[in-house]
């Protein structure tokens, strides 16, 4: 007989992953007490489209990195939403936790903590879940599974065109034994809102080659975050108007901010794909550093690089810096939102980098 399930215990802030609440709803990774963990960090809840180079750039702004790894699904090659950063100096690792833990990047709030040494008990804890109600959210999926242990990452696959759930998801637990308990408790059961029982099994079971082939096909054409040339041209037309309005309102600022912005034609922005869109940020305070730029621009989209220009003698910020973003729409929205933004006692001037922009 099918059993109707109720949601398990809920966790605070589950939209971005479980936080320390109780034994069932705690941080994805325990803070390490061993000496070898004082430089090695685990970073949870990374944006799905964030690359290893972007992860390295973000944490490299804190201090010198010995190694950096974005963890990917062995079958699909897709990011699992977490990675590891190992610093050379333990002080930099501690600073990274204090500075970047809780940083909002796109729609995610990342969690940075000390990593534990790897062991067999925490490997192969990734579950494949099918038959989910199309209306089930990622938060509800986590609530359903959180009663069995600590969830590191979760994901629901959506149709690339409609954005509607495919009814398929993944849950990665902290330990394999927790994943085993979830299979025992939920496989063949009917969660709230479901008309059919769900299937819960290990995602990387070698005996399930057919399912692996299906998963690979699902990811052959990853969900493209960035539009093609024709779509991008149409979006530029819409955003040009937004930018013109933004710069018209803020015309009281330096002419450098407005020069060349009445139309985006003729702006000297790196043109070939992959280089990104370079943004000029002016009127930064002398004590400004790269982490400030990450915190400001991260919520708008994928940031590949940030750079604060410093005085060679004093190592203080010279008042300006640069941010590179991969997507035009996101870069333009960041400019429209942050130009004229008051940071401390300074009003920032933010624009696309032009020929007349200060050089590093």
Swiss-Prot record:
It comes from the Eukaryota. Residues 39-117, 125-205, 277-355 form the RRM domain. SMART domains: RRM (SM00360). Keywords: Phosphoprotein, Repeat, RNA-binding. GO terms for biological process: cellular response to leukemia inhibitory factor. Residues 1-36 are annotated as: Disordered. Induction: Up-regulated after memory training in radial arm maze experiments. Brain; neural-specific. Expressed in the hippocampus. GO terms for molecular function: RNA binding. It holds the Pfam family RRM_1. One of its GO terms (cellular component) is ribonucleoprotein complex. CDD domains: RRM1_HuB, RRM2_HuB, RRM3_HuB. The modification Phosphoserine is found at residue 221. Interacts with IGF2BP1. Interacts with MAP1B light chain LC1. RNA-binding protein that binds to the 3' untranslated region (3'UTR) of target mRNAs. Seems to recognize a GAAA motif. Can bind to its own 3'UTR, the FOS 3'UTR and the ID 3'UTR. PANTHER family: EUKARYOTIC TRANSLATION INITIATION FACTOR 3 SUBUNIT G (PTHR10352). Belongs to the RRM elav family. This is ELAV-like protein 2. It comes from Mus musculus (Mouse).
